[in-house]
Regions:
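Canonical tetratricopeptide repeat
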Residues: 28, 62, 96, 131-132, ...
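Structural marker of alpha-solenoid helical repeat scaffolds
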Residues: 18-19, 52, 86-87, 121, ...
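Register position in tetratricopeptide repeats
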Residues: 35, 69-70, 103-104, 139-143
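Residue-level recognition of tetratricopeptide repeat
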Residues: 31, 65, 99-100, 139
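Terminal, low-structured helical/coil segments at or just beyond the last alpha-helical repeat
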Residues: 106-147
């Protein structure tokens, strides 16, 4: 998978040599590596993208995902909170924040708060996405059964 990502990234990496601080280009390269589950490589490019453009919420949200997949939930949450400081309505950041709080931090209340904020601030969210978020909220509210 890494070899495939490296091959697809070659033309973008060539462009990057002449424009090393191009946040969009760095983000594209990060997406190639993320798609092939090369999260460490992807995180490096997403980090460079947000270094070049700190307000690049999409790159910051993708960086957070990669950090989470590498086991750094705290780093992921920090990146998502930074994203939300630039764009408090960003649905992807709010959704991911809820998932990470629930899955990595066992914080259903924090997850529900993030998802409720997502629904409140994004009234035009597609119905299927609203339904999916509402389902997650309902599941997070259910008490865990002890084994």
């Amino acid at each position: 998978m890494k070899r495939m990502a490296d091959k697809k990234a070659e033309p973008l990496l060539a462009k990057l040599k002449t424009d090393p601080n191009n946040s969009q280009l760095l983000n594209q390269i990060g997406m190639l590596y993320k798609a092939t589950h090369q999260f460490k490589d992807a995180a490096g490019y997403f980090q460079k993208a947000v270094d070049a453009d700190p307000k690049n919420v999409a790159a910051r949200t993708d960086l957070a995902s990669c950090l989470f997949y590498q086991g750094d939930a705290d780093g992921a949450i920090q990146q998502l909170q930074q994203s939300l400081s630039y764009d408090p309505k960003d649905a992807n950041s709010l959704f991911n924040l809820g998932m990470i709080r629930l899955q990595a931090k066992n914080d259903p209340h924090g997850a529900i708060a993030a998802w409720q904020q997502l629904l409140k601030l994004n009234p035009k969210l597609a119905d299927d996405k609203k339904a999916a978020v509402q389902k997650l909220i309902a599941q997070a509210r259910k008490p865990k059964v002890s084994e």
